[in-house]
Amino acid sequence: MAFSMLPSIIVDALTDLTPDFLAERGIELLMLDFDNTIVPYTTDVPEPLMEQWLYDMKMSDIKLCVVSNSKNQRVRIFCKNYGIDCITHAKKPFPKGIRECLRKYGLPAGKCALAGDQIFTDTMGARFCGLTAILVTAIDNHNIWLKARHVAELPFIFFARNRRINHEES
């Protein structure tokens, strides 16, 4: 199969993904990017809706694991506080952290998805490893570099526009 940089699915927010939506697609493990996917870069405190989503997902049959490029201790502390496994220093888009997660859970790539806000790290990493790639709208583009990166991603989002899932459909 040819490699694609297009996401498999696009959602406006991580909280639009439901356990039923993922299970219907055969997803048993959802890997999550951390910064700008779960919380903004500028805080460690999730919004109440995100906090409820994390709780609901943990109560479901879908396993969660944060796979982050961050070397910052805040990711580990957050995950410990919320009872979520995490892999830091993941080096996305390279397969290191994603493969580590696959080994940890003993699941094939076809039963896993990675949700994140960046095409050039999260989507590419998921696609390199054969996972379902879920592009999430970034929580906050608080600086010029994040805004520039998202502008560079617009052509990919345009070509994948028919993969957008509305909240009502999930």
Ranges and model annotations:
Residues 2-32, 39, 43-44, 48-114, ...:
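Asp-based, Mg2+/Mn2+-dependent phosphohydrolase catalytic module
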